[in-house]
């Protein structure tokens, strides 16, 4: 909704979309996009055509995922997307998705429509060479502001690694205690 309220885009986008804080609707095809909170209660019965899970590293279990995905199939051609950085919650859904992705990519397991796109350094030592950062952040060459932010975070991490552990986890895709990724 924020992009629809941005003065830079508001006029152009309002011709194509109607929006409130809860819903965005296409004016031409009447397609509706709704956001939901992280509360699984009362969500049974949804008829979702597309479900996007953001920041999957925060999910401790499958409660929310099950509620939103069991409604799929009631609508033709259902789709799911899982988008996240790495995180510190072990043995949660993210670990399962990463393991499945590695089996698909490296062991030949059938994908069944699951497209893993995993971006991370191969080992911790690579972090000291900025040319490797693109492995964990493919958009760095196109976003100079992001590159500058990652450089700042890297310097802070070098000075105080114990206080800035999120740098390795979220920016470089390597959890604390992890030795190698691939």
Where do the PLM segments sit?
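Structural motif
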Residues: 50-52, 81
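Walker B catalytic acidic pair
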Residues: 54-58
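Extended hydrophobic-aromatic, low-complexity segments
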Residues: 45-46, 61-63
